[in-house]
Structures are given as structure tokens and as C-alpha cells.
Design a protein with these regions (language model features):
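Conserved beta-alpha-beta core of the PfkB/ribokinase-like small-molecule kinase fold
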Residues: 2-80, 96-97
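Conserved phosphate-binding/catalytic region of the ribokinase-like
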Residues: 18-22, 70-191
């Protein structure tokens, strides 16, 4: 929502969404709510709900869910979240792990126990590493609803571990591990 504040950037996003859709891209949306940037919370709520149905993958946190849906229960919120083109909901809960939902499957993965020193960029790292896995495996938007519980669990586990390494370091992008670091710091990817 940072770049959706009423400005030319909001309209640039709509144009980019149209172009990406026409090119066959998977569209993901992480509302990443930043209340101080919005003079009116209702306007923020309406804007997020304007963009949410345009996406294939919605990533939101346990802190964002109540504001967007009026409930702290992700499973109670799912019927509302599966609107428009939404095919996959990713729900992050910090040190408690993450969940993934399609209309027919769901998965959970715990986060490794680590001592966090800086959580800046953790949400971006989670969605980025999740999208990387989809790209690596050649998953298309049409295939998102067919992802199995096993595959979703594998993706969540990888992204949780990616973030577990990241939050043990200072900074955002600078804290993101390489694939080699992923293998050595969690070899053989133990919990």
C-alpha cells in the first residue's frame, strides 16, 4: 500500500497490472500496510480492496488481517479474501511460521527458532523467496490453484528458512541469504 497513496504512482500500478496480466505474469500483492502514510484509514482500506481482487497471490500478515477483514481468524477470512483473481493466500505469522491456502488445499510450516536482530524486510524476503520458487518450478497463474499441500509446505518451509537467516542480520536486502548460504546455514535444513 506504500505506493498506492493517491498519486500518479497508483495509476501507474494499474497500468502495470494490465500489462503484466496481458504478458501472462503471476500477480502478487503484499499490502504492507503503512498507516502513517495515509491520512485516512478508510481510504487505505478501500484502496487495498480495490487492488486485492486483481492479484493471483495475496500475502498478508497476522498484523494486517484484522484491519483488512475485521477478524483475527484467517480461516474465517478466507471466503472474503478469495475474491476476483485471488488463487493463493499466504499468511505470515512471524516467529510462529506461515500458512498457504488455495481454494482446495492448505499448508503450514513452522519458522526455525532463531534470535532476531532486525526484522526489516522479512515480509518482502518471504514473498520474494516464495515467488522465486514458483518461477524456478515454472508455475503459472493457471497452475496456482492446483498446488498440492506437499508443494505448498515445501515452499513455505524454504521461505521461512530464508527469513530466519535474514532476521539474524542487520538490514533488509543486505541480510538476504544466497542459495549457498541457505544450504550451509540450515544444513540439512533442520528445524
Amino acid at each position: 500500500s506504500v505506493s498506492l497513496v493517491d498519486s500518479p504512482m497508483r495509476y501507474a500500478h494499474l497500468a502495470a497490472i494490465t500489462a503484466a496480466r496481458e504478458a501472462g505474469a503471476i500477480l502478487s500483492f503484499d499490502p504492507n500496510l503503512r498507516f502513517p502514510l495515509w491520512p485516512d484509514r478508510e481510504q487505505l482500506h478501500q484502496t487495498v480492496w480495490q487492488f486485492l481482487p486483481l492479484t493471483h497471490i495475496l500475502k498478508l500478515s497476522d498484523e494486517e488481517l484484522p484491519f483488512l477483514t475485521g477478524t483475527e481468524d484467517i480461516e474465517a477470512a478466507l471466503p472474503r479474501l478469495f475474491t476476483g483473481d485471488v488463487q493463493l493466500v499466504l499468511y505470515t505469522c512471524g516467529s510462529k511460521g506461515a500458512r498457504a491456502y488455495t481454494r482446495t488445499a492448505s499448508a503450514r510450516a513452522r519458522s526455525p527458532k532463531v534470535t532476531a536482530v532486525d526484522t526489516t524486510g522479512a515480509g518482502d524476503g518471504f514473498i520474494g523467496s516464495f515467488l522465486w520458487q514458483l518461477q524456478r518450478d515454472g508455475v503459472t497463474a493457471a497452475e496456482l490453484p492446483k498446488l498440492s499441500r506437499k508443494r505448498l509446505t515445501e515452499y513455505l518451509t524454504f521461505s521461512n528458512r530464508f527469513c530466519a537467516i535474514s532476521v539474524q542480520r542487520h538490514g533488509a536486502i543486505d541480510s538476504y541469504p544466497t542459495l549457498e548460504q541457505m544450504e550451509t546455514e540450515f544444513s540439512p535444513f533442520q528445524e
